[in-house]
Amino acid sequence: MADRVYNFSAGPATLPFEVLEQAGKDIVNFKETGSGLIEISHRSPEFIEVIEKTESLVRELLEVPDNYKVLFLQGGASSQFFMVPMNLLGAGKKATYLNTGTWAKKAIKEAQLFGDIDVAYSSEESIFNHVPANDAYQVAEESEYLYFASNNTIYGTQFETMPQSKKMLVADMSSDIFSRKVDVSKFGLIFAGAQKNLGPAGVTLVIIRDDLLEKTPAHTPTMLSYKTHADKGSMFNTPPCFAIYVMGEVLAWLKNLGGVEKIEEINREKAALLYSQIDASDYYRVHAQDGSRSLMNVTFNLPTAELEAKFIAEASALQMKGLKGHRSIGGCRASIYNAFPREGVVKLVEFMQVFAANNPA
């Protein structure tokens, strides 16, 4: 579509255009029912088919083992910051956390309300410009789990390989789920807000190993218990129907593209185009250290804040939107999630070359 902009925003993010087109039709008349998708009952056969299709695609594309439940919850990924320890930590129990950015730090704060939290590593002193190697921290022997955020949108860092531990892994994959291959069997729990790679805000995907459902303390509020939602197929109460529907459509698009293996190849190519341009010039500099660079969020600076402001304004005028960095570190950020088109990255790279030539430091 000619008048669509390139949306480099960290989220909500670009969705496949064909998904938007289909959603536009289905929101008016879903499957010739005479009702819009957001009007039909969540107990209707039509919506049961939607949620079952979406779960099936999650399982297929991520190769989720049979001994895991797939849940579609509300409250955003931020609610998982307290739901995880509320469900997995009993009185007097300990968990280990890696502090690699704002969202991990928020999760640590919430977890401290429920148990003894050991922060085994923090990159805060270096403005979260890297994630740790496996030998840079130790997981407490008595820990119930090791928690980390696989990708950090604000700082543009990502675990190139997932942490290794004898302890159960718990991961916030909100900004890179389905972007690369992941061995789900290595994790006790994975969660992800939808608005980066999966659809609109409103639904949070949780993948949890069956045995953990029995660990929930008896005093846990009903709505905050994973077991409640697992037992009811994510329909203890009315689920976020539209967000689940869009997730299913996005995953169907991903499957038709070639699945996670193919999108990882595409994502690596897009990121390489952008990082190569930055590395080839002294004009731009990446915030993240080598070995920690994100495939999803490329954060970079120009020589001065004034040039950054001009860069963002001129890019916006050329239909490249959302390049302003997070307020906590400034600079620029190009978020290039799964559905972000390669031609948008090429256009940005070409603009970066022209801008540097026309605006010497």
UniProtKB/Swiss-Prot annotation:
Q: Which segments cross the bilayer?
A: none
Q: How is the cofactor bound?
A: Binds 1 pyridoxal phosphate per subunit.
Oligomeric and partner information: Homodimer.
- Catalysed transformations (reactions): O-phospho-L-serine + 2-oxoglutarate = 3-phosphooxypyruvate + L-glutamate; 4-(phosphooxy)-L-threonine + 2-oxoglutarate = (R)-3-hydroxy-2-oxo-4-phosphooxybutanoate + L-glutamate
User: EC annotation?
Assistant: 2.6.1.52
Q: Name one GO molecular function term.
A: O-phospho-L-serine:2-oxoglutarate aminotransferase activity
Give the organism, scientific name: Desulfotalea psychrophila (strain LSv54 / DSM 12343)
As given in the record, the signal peptide range reads none
Which controlled-vocabulary keywords does the entry list? Answer: Amino-acid biosynthesis, Aminotransferase, Cytoplasm, Pyridoxal phosphate, Pyridoxine biosynthesis, Serine biosynthesis, Transferase
- Protein name per UniProt: Phosphoserine aminotransferase
Q: Which InterPro entries match?
A: Aminotrans_V_dom, Aminotrans_V_PyrdxlP_BS, Pser_aminoTfrase, PyrdxlP-dep_Trfase, PyrdxlP-dep_Trfase_major, PyrdxlP-dep_Trfase_small
Question: Any idea where this protein resides?
Answer: Cytoplasm
**Which residues are involved in binding pyridoxal 5'-phosphate?**
A77, S78, W103, T153, D172, Q195, N237, T238
Q: Which GO terms describe its biological process?
A: L-serine biosynthetic process; pyridoxine biosynthetic process
